[in-house]
């Protein structure tokens, strides 16, 4: 339906806007004994109908969406750098899958937790984020692949060793919604 297509378009725009602002905070993890995480952490988790879906957490240089109630944000002093996360979680009390966006106003040592969660939709049945990596073949050609669905920035080695990338070369997003009638929109 038109409303489902519109909802899907808006959800994908929000996720892609955040992912396009993905940041690797080199100075945040500079200390050798630092346990802080930065960059991108993405994994596959169990989703609707026992399918696998993505769960992503990252730092992004975007204005705050969820902290408009903080006076400094209302006065235009948003730091513009936040922890962001997207996931599908089952509300067991209602047996409904909820697509959520997490935003932590301040960056801290734990990239996976904290901040506020907002339910964006209860219609999402597919959320897949894949990453493109360019690799050089033995013949010296560049080969591209979007087959990686898991990413965990190795904070302290990605600048020293070029085979350990801080961030992917490109990101691909695939989402689907299911309407009340069972129709799936992709």
Show where each model-derived region lies:
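Short linear sequence signals and composition-biased patches located at protein termini or domain-edge surfaces
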Residues: 118-186
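Extracytoplasmic beta-strand-rich oligomerization domains located immediately C-terminal to a leader/signal peptide
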Residues: 1-113
């Amino acid at each position: 339906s038109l409303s489902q297509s519109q909802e899907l378009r808006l959800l994908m725009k929000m996720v892609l806007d955040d992912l396009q602002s993905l940041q690797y905070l080199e100075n945040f993890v500079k200390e050798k004994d630092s346990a802080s995480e930065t960059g991108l952490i993405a994994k596959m988790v169990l989703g609707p109908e026992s399918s696998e879906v993505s769960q992503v957490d990252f730092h992004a240089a975007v204005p705050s969406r969820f902290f408009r109630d903080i006076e400094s944000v209302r006065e235009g002093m948003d730091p513009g750098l936040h922890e962001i996360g997207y996931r599908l979680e089952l509300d067991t009390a209602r047996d409904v899958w909820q697509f959520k966006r997490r935003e932590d106003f301040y960056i801290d040592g734990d990239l996976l937790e904290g901040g506020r969660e907002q339910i964006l939709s209860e219609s999402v049945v597919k959320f897949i984020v894949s990453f493109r990596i360019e690799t050089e073949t033995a013949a010296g050609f560049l080969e591209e692949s979007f087959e990686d669905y898991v990413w965990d920035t190795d904070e302290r080695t990605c600048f020293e060793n070029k085979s350990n990338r801080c961030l992917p070369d490109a990101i691909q997003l695939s989402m689907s919604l299911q309407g009340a009638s069972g129709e799936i929109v992709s």
